[in-house]
Amino acid sequence: VVCQDKQLTKDEYHKLLGKAKMVFSANTQETLGISPYEGILVGAMPLVPDRLSYTEMYDDMWKYDSRWTTSYASYQINKEKLVNMIKDDMQNYDNKLPKLEELKQKLTDMYFSATNLLNTIHSYGEKENKETKEKSRKISLTV
């Protein structure tokens, strides 16, 4: 188990991440969840709290009860549950790999790719162009 308590360069971070089987988050503030996703890309399974963006992005099998890490005191109370969950996940790593691949694809498609956003913007542009052309046609017919 590695806790990052020192500054790493991006290269050092990615090398360490490439050796990991799990990426654990106890974040109480997170907007995108990039660290667990980076881990998933190199085959590390995520274990994230059921809060923040993680609630929407991750299935239950990758989440733990968010109350377990809302504070150091709550972590101390729930430490055994969390340790048991980590042990269970690590022992079942090989069995979880197919689900990890599914998760990687889901996150890539839904949250870490511009394809959906670009398609949506493009469809709005097409709709706008169609409406503009229709208005122009009506104006030219009345003139």
Task: List the predicted regions and their residue ranges.
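Aromatic "clamp/platform" in nucleotide-sugar-dependent glycosyltransferases that forms part
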Residues: 27-28
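Short alpha-helical segment that forms part of, or immediately flanks, the ligand-binding pocket
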Residues: 14, 37-41, 55
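A charged, aromatic-enriched C-terminal amphipathic alpha-helix characteristic of glycosyltransferases
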Residues: 70-141
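Short hydrophobic beta-strand element within catalytic cores of glycosyltransferases
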Residues: 45-48
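Nucleotide-activated donor-binding/catalytic signature segment of Leloir-type glycosyltransferases, i.e.
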Residues: 1-7
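Short alpha-helical donor nucleotide-sugar binding micro-motif in glycosyltransferases
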Residues: 14-20
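Short acidic/histidine- and often glycine-rich active-site loop of Leloir-type glycosyltransferases
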Residues: 50-66
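A short hydrophobic beta-strand element within the catalytic core of glycosyltransferases
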Residues: 23-24
